Swiss-Prot record:
Keyword Magnesium carried by entry: no
Family annotation (Pfam families): EPSP_synthase
Protein name: 3-phosphoshikimate 1-carboxyvinyltransferase
Chief place of localization: cytoplasm
Record-level Gene Ontology MF annotations: 3-phosphoshikimate 1-carboxyvinyltransferase activity
Subcellular locations according to the entry: Cytoplasm
Residues that coordinate or bind 3-phosphoshikimate: K22, S23, R27, S170, S171, Q172, S198, D314, N337, K341
The EC number(s) this enzyme carries: 2.5.1.19
Pathway info: Metabolic intermediate biosynthesis; chorismate biosynthesis; chorismate from D-erythrose 4-phosphate and phosphoenolpyruvate: step 6/7
Protein family (similarity comment): Belongs to the EPSP synthase family.
Any Gene Ontology biological process: aromatic amino acid family biosynthetic process
Upper classification of the organism: Bacteria, Pseudomonadati, Pseudomonadota, Gammaproteobacteria, Alteromonadales
Catalytic activity: 3-phosphoshikimate + phosphoenolpyruvate = 5-O-(1-carboxyvinyl)-3-phosphoshikimate + phosphate
Length: 426
């Protein structure tokens, strides 16, 4: 197994241009596919999850042209649904942002489509989405365990109507349903059961749909109305914002060991909820400066916070490791959906924080972290989870440094993360 040793870092400073958002990249690729016209996507993320989506689209007959560095994609839309005369089997790795939306989109047309993935994908729930699609007339069959991939879709189109979907597990279920609803045979009313997690991710979806000419009526996140007869029209160009979750590591670095760290590609005009991570750092005592398309973090003594972070679940992981450098006990609440991500992130985070000496209380949907008097060095397991590797890079700011196991797992969203992280040192 590959390991990366991060020696102690005294101070960080510099500027990082954040690579494109995974969430926006895969949503935009699917909408461009369903749209009429050719769309040029710029600042597209070049990572494993996006490659799985692109490979699947190519297999489904979608034509696109990628720039040499894979960050510009010119895609010819189908002007409607995806159909195939022959049976197709698509491998989607561990890319939830490809599996859930494609599962929904492939019910719209005609054909037989089988969706598979890595072993962890077979543990990531999709049942709530499939139940909703079945209610609208879709024929979806599980190949192993009910409620989980792999699955086969025998597509004949999607009816309109009223449908319920759970909101308390993953916003990706609702996102997938929203994106396909305009191409159903009738109007669709989506009723959300339970508290909707990660509302800002739904805002991203609705904003992108609007860019492609489709209107969603949002009744206070409890009901969403999509009127029949709409179609996606290419806006010609889509700029993919920098990934706000990825920005969190560099902003935390600035807060802990700044110096001054500036991230560009996200800012106050961002449509991503995870930019609110900077507000949490500010509550902890960091000096934060906002621009339209940049955020600056400067170092200052940090104190613990006790906050509901349901609205920023991915970026909240960075707070868990930043808490080791804050005075007092930090509590991160309402984060049950950490458990159904690339790994069970609540259990993984608790295990690895204890390795470095932290006192940790792991609840069903919260984590409570008290830093040790002296942080210990350790070998951090990353569970094939990109965010675990990036979060624990913060331990380079301890006097003892840290070792990261399987550092290349960052290829899911940020292949050259550790190179960029090193550029801030000195």
């Amino acid at each position: 197994m590959k390991q990366l040793r991060l020696e102690p870092v005294v101070q960080v400073r510099g500027e990082i241009n954040i690579p494109g958002s995974k969430s926006i990249s895969n949503r935009a690729l699917l909408l461009a596919t369903l749209a009429q016209g050719t769309t040029t996507l710029t600042n597209l993320l070049d990572s494993d999850d996006i490659r799985h989506m692109l490979a699947s689209l190519k297999q489904l007959g979608v034509n696109y042209r990628l720039s040499q560095n894979n960050t510009v994609c010119e895609l010819d839309g189908l002007g409607g649904v995806i159909s195939s005369a022959s049976a197709q089997e698509l491998f989607l790795g561990n890319a939830g942002t490809a599996m859930r939306p494609l599962c929904a989109a492939l019910t719209l047309g005609q054909g037989e489509f089988t969706l598979t993935g890595e072993p962890r994908m077979e543990e990531r729930p999709i049942g709530d989405l499939v139940d909703a699609l079945r209610k609208l007339g879709a024929n979806v069959v599980y190949l192993k365990n009910d409620g989980f991939p792999p699955l086969t879709i025998n597509a004949t189109g999607l009816n309109g109507g009223d449908v319920e979907i759970a909101g308390d597990l993953s916003s990706q279920f609702l996102t997938a349903l929203l994106m396909v609803a305009p191409l159903a045979k009738g109007s669709v009313n989506i009723h959300v059961k339970g508290e909707l997690v990660s509302k800002p991710y739904i805002d991203i979806t609705i904003a992108l749909m609007a860019q492609f000419g489709v209107n969603v009526i949002n009744h206070d996140y409890a009901r969403f109305e999509i009127v029949a007869g709409q179609r996606y029209i290419s806006p010609c160009k889509v700029l993919v914002e920098g990934d706000a979750s990825s920005a969190s590591y560099f902003l935390a670095a600035g807060a802990i060991k700044g110096g001054e760290v500036k991230v560009t590609g996200v800012g106050r005009l961002s449509i991503q909820g995870d930019v609110k991570f900077a507000d949490v750092l500010e509550k902890m005592g960091a000096d934060i400066e906002w621009g339209d398309d940049y955020i600056i973090a400067r170092g200052s003594p940090l104190t613990a916070v006790d906050l509901d972070m349901n609205h920023i679940p991915d970026a909240a992981m960075t707070i868990a490791t930043a808490a080791l450098f804050a005075k007092g006990t930090t509590v991160i609440r309402n984060i049950y959906n950490w458990r159904i991500k690339e790994t069970d992130r609540l259990a993984a985070m608790a295990t690895e924080l204890r390795k470095v000496g932290a006192e940790v209380e792991e609840g069903n949907d919260y984590i409570k972290i008290t830093p040790p008097a002296v942080i210990n060095t350790a070998e951090i397991d990353t569970y094939n989870d990109h965010r675990m590797a990036m979060c624990f890079s913060m331990l380079a700011f301890a006097d003892c440094g840290i070792t990261i196991n399987d550092p290349d797992c960052t290829s899911k969203t940020f292949p050259d993360y550790f190179k960029q992280f090193a550029s801030l040192q000195g």
